[in-house]
Amino acid sequence: MSKEEKIREMCKFIILNLSSIRVIDSSYRFRNIFLTSLGILINESAIIQDLIKEGMIKSEGLIDKSPFYKFISCTEKGKKYYDNNIYKVIIPESYFSEKRLDLVKIFLGLKRPS
């Protein structure tokens, strides 16, 4: 698995985890987390679209002519997939600083905030 594939898979699990905790008003939140908090430039809308097609999350569609999805929540199928596969996620640790690596683990649900 390439570094890009590992990062995409990791982002998928971040989306599943956070949307299982509570309904996410806008997918812009994920863009902010990935870009600002973690320094990852990725098309979160494409990942969300794939997760919707797979039945792992649901959304009320796009926000008026924008690339952002509204009201995103994890389905039971998504929660089960997350629970069964979260420990298989490979975090490309060399890609992140120590502080960002801690944030990755927190967003993945593998570590509690201190």
Model region roles, listed by residue range:
Residues 52-63:
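A short, conserved structural fragment
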Residues 1-5, 112-114:
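Short, Lys/Arg-enriched, disordered terminal segments
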